[in-house]
């Protein structure tokens, strides 16, 4: 009887682990669907690091390369090219992707 309880407990624990993994996957999927506030947080983090972003793809097809995030406002991101100090003011909604991809 103790063995049955042990097996039941292990099965329940396995079920809980499975449900937890599904919840984690669901949260990760929903956070990677382009939520503007998530993008804004990531850009703020990039600004704090101060390292160049290798590529920023914009909705109009333009690409900014090797730029530094200078400022992140509510709806606007200011990128700067460290080679020639030119700045680009980009609407946050215009950023399709950024980083290495």
From Swiss-Prot:
Name of the coding gene: cgeC
Entries under NCBIfam families matching the protein: spor_mat_CgeC
InterPro entries: CgeC-like
Role this protein plays: May be involved in maturation of the outermost layer of the spore.
Protein name from the UniProt record: Protein CgeC
Superkingdom in the source lineage: Bacteria
């Amino acid at each position: 009887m103790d063995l049955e309880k042990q097996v039941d407990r292990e099965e329940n624990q396995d079920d809980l682990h499975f449900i937890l993994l599904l919840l984690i996957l669901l949260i990760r999927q929903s956070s990677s669907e382009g939520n503007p506030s998530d993008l804004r947080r990531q850009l703020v983090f990039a600004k704090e690091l101060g390292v160049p972003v290798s590529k920023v793809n914009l909705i109009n097809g333009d690409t900014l390369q090797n730029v530094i995030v200078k400022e992140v406002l509510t709806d606007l991101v200011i990128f700067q090219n460290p080679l020639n100090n030119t700045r680009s003011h980009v609407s946050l909604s215009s950023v399709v992707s950024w980083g290495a991809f």
